[in-house]
Swiss-Prot record:
GO molecular function: ATP binding; catalytic activity, acting on a protein; magnesium ion binding; phenylalanine-tRNA ligase activity; transferase activity; tRNA binding
CDD domains: PheRS_alpha_core
Swiss-Prot/TrEMBL cofactor(s): Mg(2+)
Subcellular location(s) of the protein: Cytoplasm
Keyword terms of this UniProt record: Aminoacyl-tRNA synthetase, ATP-binding, Cytoplasm, Ligase, Magnesium, Metal-binding, Nucleotide-binding, Protein biosynthesis
Listed Pfam families: Phe_tRNA-synt_N (PF02912), tRNA-synt_2d (PF01409)
Protein family according to the UniProt entry: Belongs to the class-II aminoacyl-tRNA synthetase family. Phe-tRNA synthetase alpha subunit type 1 subfamily.
This protein's record includes keyword Nuclease: no
Gene (name only): pheS
PANTHER family documented for this protein: PHENYLALANINE--TRNA LIGASE, MITOCHONDRIAL (PTHR11538:SF41), PHENYLALANYL-TRNA SYNTHETASE (PTHR11538)
Record protein name field: Phenylalanine--tRNA ligase alpha subunit
Length: 341
């Protein structure tokens, strides 16, 4: 019996030694130590061994099992270490290789226009005021010479949150807050999002506006025209000129629409200016006396002008975008082409 156990031991150790992988080791383990393994068969045959020999046979079997298991464990650890080393080698990062360059991001076209306009206006001495998007009906309409029964309220489809509060339809509401908080002279621009129930190729339910207000002694429409001339030259080029057309806004009198000479065809007529040679860019006017008086400003001493610029409109003109929805779709194929830097 001892010779048989010794043969099993030598055979197992030899096969373990020449095994070339974990799969082969598992085969050896099953063949020697498994339920149907050779060493297990010896234990099952103990009933045929003389009683006085059984302790010795059991000892030989246990010694063989321990030797086989020890060598198996050592070989398994060796193969696992080699596999881990190969994995590390395959995944190793060569730190000397050039890295992939990060893609340069651009500011959104509307943000670029907002920053450009803010820089132009601050260079002219304007302060920047940030208003609130949820506004009181009084500041959005009533204080701007548009009381509840005024037909001019129908000029804008408004998102009401309650009978008293709404999503502001114009940054003009910021004028009232500023005039209530400050005494003239006042020179301020107020950029921000506004909300109207509009949705087509040139309008969006949410868009960005920049309101401007100047209040001081002796302010006239001529001052407005001079400021606008400087603005468009800095924004669109020194050869661009402006013209004023009569219009109507309840909070200015007189009111004007401001056009710029087409910077694409230079007045000859093209698709951008629809053959007219002029492009509408903003609305403006002399602040209505009722608006000033409502804020406690003496209209015998002070006057002012105001203007409102749609930033998406300027971005579309400046960057040749023909549909306002492209500014809200986050399409990198469009946005990657626009970078003033």
């Amino acid at each position: 019996m001892r010779d048989k156990i010794q043969q099993i031991r030598e055979k197992a150790l030899a096969e373990i030694d020449k095994a070339d992988g974990l799969e082969k080791l598992n085969d050896v383990r099953a063949a020697i130590l498994g339920k149907k393994g050779e060493l297990t068969a010896v234990l099952k045959g103990m009933k045929d061994v003389a009683p006085d020999e059984r302790p010795k046979v059991g000892q030989w079997v246990n010694e063989t099992r321990e030797a086989v298991e020890k060598l198996l464990d050592e070989k398994v650890k060796k193969f696992e270490a080699e596999a881990l080393k190969r994995k590390y080698e395959s995944e190793k990062i060569d730190v000397t290789m050039p890295a992939k360059r990060s893609k340069k991001g651009n500011l959104h076209p509307v943000t670029q226009v907002k920053d450009q306009l803010s820089e132009i206006f601050t260079s002219m001495g304007f302060e920047v005021y940030e208003g609130t998007e949820i506004e009181n009906d009084y500041y959005n309409f009533t204080a701007l010479n548009t009381p509840k029964d005024h037909p001019a309220r129908d000029m804008q489809d408004t998102f009401y949150l309650s009978p008293e509060f709404l999503l502001r339809t114009q940054t003009s509401a910021g004028q009232i807050h500023v005039m209530e908080a400050k005494k003239p002279p006042i020179k301020v621009v107020s950029p921000g999002k506004v909300f109207r129930s509009d949705d087509d190729a040139t309008h969006s339910p949410m868009f960005t506006q920049m309101e401007g207000l100047v209040v001081d002694k002796g302010i006239t429409l001529c001052d407005l025209k001079g400021m606008l001339d400087q603005l468009v030259k800095k924004m669109f080029g020194k050869n661009v000129t402006t013209r004023l057309r009569p219009s109507y806004f309840p909070f200015t009198e007189p009111s004007v629409e401001v056009d710029v000479s087409c910077f694409q065809c230079h007045g000859k007529g093209c698709s951008l200016c629809k053959g007219t040679g002029w492009i509408e860019v903003l609305g403006a006017g002399v602040v209505n006396k009722k608006v000033l008086e409502g804020c406690g400003i003496d209209t015998n001493e002070y006057s002012g002008f105001a203007f409102g610029i749609g930033l998406e409109r300027i971005a579309m003109l400046k960057y040749g975008i023909n549909n306002i929805k492209l500014l809200f779709e986050s399409d990198l194929r469009v946005l990657d082409q626009i970078d003033d830097n």
